Amino acid sequence: MEKLLMTNTLWNSVDELPIHDSWKPVLKPVEDAIRKLGVFLAEEEFLPPVDDVFRAFSYPFDAVKVLIMGQDPYPTPGHAMGLSFSTQPDVRPLPRSLNNIFKELVSDVGSLGDSASEQGALDLGINAPGSVAGTQVALPADGDLRAWSNQGVALFNRVLTVHPGQAGSHKGKGWEAVTEQAIKALAERDQPLVAILWGKQAQEVQKFLGDTPCICSVHPSPLSASRGFFGSKPFSRANEILSSLGATEIDWSL
C-alpha cells in the first residue's frame, strides 16, 4: 500500500523541485521527507500554490547572507507566496505582522518625510510613524519582499505549507526536517551569515546555527510587537554585522 501511495506525490525527487541547482545537493539528504510531504499534500488543500512552496530555495545557496525565519505561510488565500512574511504585490491591507515589520523598518533605517510616503502608508493600511532624521529607506510600496531575496536574504518559514484558514495546521507533518537541513547547511558554509529570529518558534532554530550571529526579539505580531520588537533595530544591526564580517550590506529599501 505504501509503495502505491508513494506514486501519488507532488515531488518524486529533489531534482524535480523548482529550486536553484545549488540547493539540490543540500536538500538531497531529506529527499525522502520531501517525497512523503508530497504524498500528504497531494490529498490536501494547502497554501501557497504548489509552484511557490519552494520559492525561498529558488535563489543561490552561496548568495545567502541573512536568514529571516518565519513560522508558516499566511493562511489567508492570496497572501502566501513562498517567502516568509512576504505577500503578493496586490495584497491590501497588509497582514498585521508585516505591517509591524514595515513600521520597524522605517523607524530603523527609513523615513516618512514626504506626502507621497504618507499617502502610501494610508494605502497600505499602515499607521505611519514620524520621520526619522538621517535615514534613507522610504515606506515600501507593497508587501512583496523579493527585492530582499535578490540580495541574499533567505526568507524561510519553518513549515512551508498550511491549510487555508488554519494557521499552524501543517506543523509536525515533516517540513521541520527539511528546513533544519537547509539551516544547518547555511551555517556550515565558510561564509558570512546573520540570522534574524523573531519569536520563540523562530528562535528554536538557533541550535542549528552554530556560531552564526543571531538577532533575536519577540514576534512582530500585534500581540507581542510592543514588548520588544519595536525598537529592536534588526535591519541596521544585521548590516553592522555583515560589514564587520566583510560582506556587502543589504539595501533594505523595497
From Swiss-Prot:
Record-linked InterPro entries: UDG_fam1, Ura-DNA_Glyclase_AS, Uracil-DNA_glycosylase-like, Uracil-DNA_glycosylase-like_sf
SMART domains per UniProt: UDG, UreE_C
Keyword annotations from UniProtKB, A to Z: Cytoplasm, DNA damage, DNA repair, Hydrolase
Segments of this protein annotated with the region Insert: 111-136
Listed PROSITE patterns: U_DNA_GLYCOSYLASE
GO CC terms in record: cytoplasm
GO molecular function terms noted in the UniProt entry: uracil DNA N-glycosylase activity
Catalytic activity: Hydrolyzes single-stranded DNA or mismatched double-stranded DNA and polynucleotides, releasing free uracil
Superkingdom in the source lineage: Bacteria
Subcellular location: Cytoplasm
GO biological process per UniProt: base-excision repair, AP site formation via deaminated base removal
Active site, per annotation: D72 (proton acceptor)
EC number: 3.2.2.27
Job description of the protein: Excises uracil residues from the DNA which can arise as a result of misincorporation of dUMP residues by DNA polymerase or due to deamination of cytosine.
Family: Belongs to the uracil-DNA glycosylase (UDG) superfamily. UNG family.
PANTHER family: URACIL-DNA GLYCOSYLASE
Protein name per its UniProtKB record: Uracil-DNA glycosylase
Originating species: Corynebacterium glutamicum (strain ATCC 13032 / DSM 20300 / JCM 1318 / BCRC 11384 / CCUG 27702 / LMG 3730 / NBRC 12168 / NCIMB 10025 / NRRL B-2784 / 534)
Name of the coding gene: ung
